[in-house]
Amino acid sequence: VTSNNYVQSVSGGVTGAPVRGRAERDRAFRAAAAAGARPPRVAILGAGAGGLCAAIQLRLAGIDSVSIYERSDGVGGTWRDNTYPGAACDVPSHLYSFSFASKPDWSRKFAPQPEILSYLKSLVDTYDLHDTLRCRTEVTDLSWDEVGGVWILGLVDADGRRTREEADVVVSALGQLNRPFVPDIPGLEEFNGRVFHSARWDHDHDLRGERVGVIGIGASAIQFVPPVAAMARSLVLFQRSANYVAPRGDRPYPSWLRAAFTRWPRLQRAYRDSIYWRLEARFNLMRKDSRLGRMLASQFAKRLRPLVGNKLSEESLIPDYPPGCKRILIADDWYPTLLRSNVEVVTDAVERITPSGVVTADGQERPLDTLIFGTGFTSTEFLAPMRVTGRNGIDLNEVWKDGAAAFLGLSVPGFPNLFMLYGPNTNLGHNSILFMIEQQVGYMV
């Protein structure tokens, strides 16, 4: 009995009305298994938050034939890779976690990277996912076998050995933050100093006393620039456009509150819900031509204009676009850092890189010892560089050549039983992406 029979019997396709609700769905799964139907084999790509969430919910639903393919040597995804100084969440900790795996003892309002990574690792132990992990194994291509009704996965391990395996369902949990983007700037390869991306931080390189340059000022730079400024001899920030930076208000949670959350889970749930609705209310700020957005932009400019002077220009401080066009950042130490005597903000475009520094459009060269890219990720190239071939030989890259799109950000016609978590048009600028992922997984399961 095939997995298609299993899915049909659960969905009601051949036996009755569609299943509604988790309890009814779980009973249907068990009934289908008892009838001898084979549960689907599910391949999950990526062992970050999305991949772990999918594996947990599939297992809780009675689907045990799950494999997580991870090209790295451990779980954690972006929280494994991003270890730069100051790395932390910009969503309150109690909402940057899954509702089914609450953590009442978060140390701070905005958890640091090591604590988030520890939380994700704990999910593997709590839900016994060790046997599902296929670390140091990368999926290079996916192709749909119409005759067998399965996906064929091309795999390569750490030793370069290539194999092929089958799966009835594929869940891509690669996300949008796995491939660092470094712009193609003339002369980059000629630079004599040290160069690295913030997502590949060089912890062996000592920045103390150095002349450091940062290209790209966004969500990562807003966190690592202040500690770098404190240790570098000089720091030049090459900024294309100013950001909206709201106060962070980070603070440690007192022991009594952590104890209360542990003793009374409903109290923590109420606190989590209050965070969600408070953040969700901010969406109105980001609507095009919204009155609230215009008010925020006006107040923001009014608050920052007193900082404009010989050191900082209006262009370097005040955005020339409405709130929400870029992610609104949060920090308490950003503007004090810009006012430091060893920090310079450059708004002229980067023209080229020389062996000794960076030349901007005004013709001026800033000599540097180290260049750090805070230029984000190739977040619009979903599933790249993996090749995905669906029904009738259609290539997903070809389908998306004019822009990526998917039903609910999850699935694309012509690619059966292929789901994407954190897919096209699912990024958020105001709330928790883990909440989004959990809802997508619930729909997918």
Predicted regions and their residues:
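Beta1-alpha1 glycine-rich phosphate/pyrophosphate-binding loop at the start
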Residues: 3-8, 40-133, 239-240, 306-312
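Rossmann-like dinucleotide-binding core of oxidoreductases
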Residues: 32-39, 45, 49, 53-74, ...
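Short beta-strand to alpha-helix junction loop
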Residues: 103-122, 288-295, 321-333
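Feature captures the FAD/FMN-dependent oxidoreductase FAD-binding
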Residues: 108-177
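Helical element adjacent to the flavin cofactor pocket in flavoenzyme catalytic cores
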Residues: 116-133, 327-352
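A conserved short coil-to-beta-strand element within the FAD-binding core of flavoproteins
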Residues: 135-150, 344-361
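Core beta-strand elements of the Rossmann-like FAD/NAD(P) dinucleotide-binding domain
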Residues: 159-169, 208, 361-370
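Glycine/threonine-rich phosphate-binding loop and adjacent beta-strand/alpha-helix elements that clamp
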Residues: 374-445
